[in-house]
Amino acid sequence: MSGLSIENISMRFDLPNGSSVQALKNVSLHLKEGELMSVLGPSGCGKTTLLNIVAGFLAPTEGHIAMNGHKVHGPNAERGMVFQQGALFEWMNVRDNVSFGPRMKGQRASQYGSHVDHLLDVTGLGDFKDKAIYELSGGMQQRVALARCLANDPDVILMDEPLGALDALTREKMQGLVLKLWKETGKTIILITHSVEEALLLGERLLVMAPRPGRIHKEYRLPYADMGVNADLREVKKSEGYSQTREEILSMIWDMEEEIMGRTEAAQ
């Protein structure tokens, strides 16, 4: 089966006191090639844990990850990661950061140069390619992180709240850029976010996860990502059904948060 499969994933963490925490339980889903999926849920629902398992940074207690029908173990070049903080090399300029992956694979400049230059242009970094990382704003640094990930040409891009630290205007611009690159590259993307609006705009599929243990609570199929590729995102928010779905999800997550607080108070 082509695409990314998450097969019956469970994750339990052992604690120093001898007890354990069930972070995820029986999570299964399949993403077709080129799908854009956003993942929402209250704190502690296992969103980042799930992403780290897909990336290969964590081995699940049960279940497995498969790419195109083959089980995968540990990180590899098929899956690229974009973090909330860019994790960039401060001592390199923008172009050297973006071309780092191809260079580490032993490619010559003649092999990767045109691809890297295209990524710099499409992400708006062409005029900044010789700049040091510390000279860039947070939004520009995230552009570098995204371009660096794409330079490795992964099949799947995993994004862990990559826009969470940005101001509102920069965040909106970056959301538009993510949609543009998704359509241009045809990559499969999983995006973790705490923002309901962002999840609606950047997810043709949207998963809401529930906590303790982390599991899939509800799934939505949405039109807004496709609409946003060629439209102002502020106009997309005025689309039929957008506000109703937004309020439904907000209420759902609010109820989960209330339940968590109730459990915590009862345990004290």
Curated annotation (Swiss-Prot):
What is the species listed in this Swiss-Prot or TrEMBL entry?
Ruegeria pomeroyi (strain ATCC 700808 / DSM 15171 / DSS-3)
Per the record, a Pfam family?
ABC_tran
- Catalysis performed (reactions): taurine(out) + ATP + H2O = taurine(in) + ADP + phosphate + H(+)
Q: Which UniProt keywords apply?
A: ATP-binding, Cell inner membrane, Cell membrane, Membrane, Nucleotide-binding, Translocase, Transport
Q: What is this protein called?
A: Taurine import ATP-binding protein TauB
State the encoding gene.
tauB
* Protein family per UniProt: Belongs to the ABC transporter superfamily. Taurine importer (TC 3.A.1.17.1) family.
Q: Which chain positions lie within coiled-coil regions?
A: none
Q: Which residues form the ABC transporter domain?
A: 4-236
Q: Which taxonomic lineage is given here? A: Bacteria, Pseudomonadati, Pseudomonadota, Alphaproteobacteria, Rhodobacterales
| UniProt function note | Part of the ABC transporter complex TauABC involved in taurine import. Responsible for energy coupling to the transport system.
- Describe its assembly: The complex is composed of two ATP-binding proteins (TauB), two transmembrane proteins (TauC) and a solute-binding protein (TauA).
